[in-house]
């Protein structure tokens, strides 16, 4: 009977330990998923910022090009 009790306690102990390990892995997995989601959100925000900067640079390039074209035209065809 004592052997049966020890075996039962051993089985229960091992079951609790394995359950504890599974719960810990599950928590780690959830934390990793949260971090990945946060990284994706940051990536989306960074992409928006990059697009905004590229649009600003594009518009600045257009303005500089128009000014340069006007300067060249005035240089080639000066008004008197």
Swiss-Prot record:
Subcellular location as annotated: Secreted
GO terms of biological process kind: defense response to bacterium
Keywords in alphabetical order: Amphibian defense peptide, Antibiotic, Antimicrobial, Cleavage on pair of basic residues, Secreted, Signal
Tissue/organ expression: Expressed by the skin glands.
GO cellular component, one term: extracellular region
InterPro entries cross-referenced by the UniProt entry: Frog_antimicrobial_propeptide, FSAP
Primary role: Has antibacterial activity.
Name listed for the protein in its UniProt record: Raniseptin-5
Organism: Boana raniceps
Organism ancestry: Eukaryota, Metazoa, Chordata, Craniata, Vertebrata
């Amino acid at each position: 009977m004592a052997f049966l009790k020890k075996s039962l306690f051993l089985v229960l102990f091992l079951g609790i330990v394995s359950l504890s390990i599974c719960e810990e892995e599950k928590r780690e997995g959830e934390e990793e998923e949260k971090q990945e989601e946060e990284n994706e959100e940051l990536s989306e925000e960074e992409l928006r910022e990059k697009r905004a900067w590229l649009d600003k640079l594009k518009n600045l390039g257009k303005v500089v090009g128009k000014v340069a074209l006007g300067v060249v035209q005035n240089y080639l065809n000066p008004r008197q």
